Amino acid sequence: MKLNKIHHVAVICSDYEKSKHFYTDVLGMKIVSENYREGRDSLKADCWLDDNYVIELFSFPNPPARPSYPEAAGLRHLAFEVDDLSEAIDELDGKGIAHEPIRTDEYTDKRFVFFSDPDGLPIELYEK
């Protein structure tokens, strides 16, 4: 099997409007499709970044919380590449988004930082 790329990552949120604001207004993604699925009582948004499908944002009634932070089995975090980490952190600060201190990858010598989405899903910004 030859995999070409990651097509998208699905994220279930507890507060759809809050998460929609976070992924669009804070992270700068664009919603290209948004639908209400009556049979599941669920909203679904397809979020794109630079013309690439990235996040499938779902709402479901009463989803359970993440079992632990962040070491539960399964998806650990989402990572996005940025050109300038300091500039990206300034934007997070300007939008009131708390983040951890900047760290440096011991293997690549690249800088990175972690913060969380509204449901506590860890997100990493990794400098190019």
Regions found by a protein language model. Give the residues of each.
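Exposed loop/turn and edge beta-strand positions of beta-sandwich/beta-sheet ligand-binding modules
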Residues: K5, D41-L43, G74, D109
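N-terminal beta-strand motif that seeds the catalytic metal site of vicinal oxygen chelate
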Residues: M1-E17, L75-L78
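Short, charged/polar surface micro-motifs in flexible loops or helix N-caps
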Residues: D51-V54, N62-P63, L85
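A short, acidic/glycine-rich surface segment
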Residues: V32-E34, R40-L43, N62-S68, P101
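Mid-chain, well-packed structural core segment of small domains
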Residues: E71, L78-S86
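Core segments of cupin and vicinal oxygen chelate
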Residues: V11-V54, G94
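Vicinal oxygen chelate
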Residues: M1-K2, N35, D46, I89-K128
